[in-house]
Amino acid sequence: MTLCYLIFDASDDGADTGSWEAMASVRAADLPAVLAEVQQVLTAAARHSPGPRGALDEGGAWDADQQVQTDGDWTTVTLTLTGPWAWGEALMERFTLAE
């Protein structure tokens, strides 16, 4: 799958848990495309999940947080995934960046 807006940065906590965060700031005309990319990532994450979704400290195997904030003509969408490092890295390999 090709992503045009979301570029993920990964961080590892050293205990085999990682987080992957992407942020896109767009004008209203591009917001539907960004939200569609977010949905693609969430669908893939759920389809290939390592277990139940939920807060890791409450027994979940993975989780996601989506934030949308509008400031004037711009809307910023942030997506953060957390879960096992191997799962997240394999998930990220499913996506390619548009050139």
How does the language model describe each region?
Residues 1-51, 58:
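Long, contiguous N-terminal structural blocks used for assembly/anchoring
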Residues 3-4, 66-74, 96-99:
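A structural signal for the main folded, soluble domain(s) of proteins
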Residues 4-7, 81, 94:
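Intrinsic disorder/low-structure terminal segments
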Residues 13, 28, 70, 93-96:
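Amphipathic alpha-helical interaction segments
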Residues 36-86:
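Amphipathic protein-protein interaction modules
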Residues 84, 88-99:
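Mixed-charge, glycine-accented linear interaction segment located at domain edges/termini
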